[in-house]
Design a protein with these regions (language model features):
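Non-catalytic substrate/cofactor recognition surfaces at enzyme active-site rims
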Residues: 1-184
Length: 184
């Protein structure tokens, strides 16, 4: 019953938005792509040794406890390269900007890109062109929620979001000016 109410409301709002849309021919579509290198938060030799010791003592290696899972991740991350290459894209469709980031982007990061974009409207697509884990802000790293714990799903340097924000805003700036300079 409740789902029917919600579905009808969504349908009505969608219909009104569609009906009131301004359609136009010949909308310009442009795109800029850049790849940037970001650091990997690697464990120290002591952290790896402690993780291996914990795993050696695990009661059931097939059913690890949470701290043992993170120990396993510490060992795995030690084998990662020191940097990873991350593909970023920015598209312009008319006055709309679209940013594609291969991470689970925190809301505050997407909102910052939207608010600082030189284009009239901008939205962010997360988990695009790959997967590089969570993308917390430096402030979130300081708070230390599970999304920041070093693992295969959170391994980028603590300043990764800052670098991604600045790079995508530069890309949107290129698109807003209608030039192709600065893109790959």
């Amino acid at each position: 019953e409740r789902i029917g109410v919600v579905a009808r409301r969504v349908a009505v709002v969608t219909y009104h938005a569609w009906r009131d849309m301004k359609h136009s021919d010949g909308v310009k579509v442009t795109m800029v792509e850049r790849a940037i290198d970001l650091g990997v938060r690697k464990p120290s030799a002591d952290e790896v040794a402690a993780a291996k010791q914990m795993l050696a003592k695990a009661a059931d290696p097939k059913r690890l406890k949470m701290d043992e899972i993170y120990a396993q991740e510490t060992v795995r991350i030690d084998d990662y390269p020191d940097t990873v290459n991350v593909k970023l894209q920015a598209l312009r469709v008319g006055e709309l900007g679209i940013v594609a980031i291969p991470c689970e982007v925190f809301a505050e990061i997407g909102l910052e890109i939207k608010s600082r974009s030189p284009l009239k409207s901008t939205f962010v697509i997360a988990l695009a062109n790959g997967y590089n884990g969570y993308l917390p802000s430096p402030a979130q790293h300081e708070l230390g929620g599970y999304e920041t714990w070093r693992s295969g799903w959170s391994y980028l340097e603590t300043e990764a979001s800052t670098k991604i924000i600045e790079t995508t805003l530069e890309m949107l700036g290129v698109l807003a000016k209608g030039t192709r300079s600065g893109g790959n």
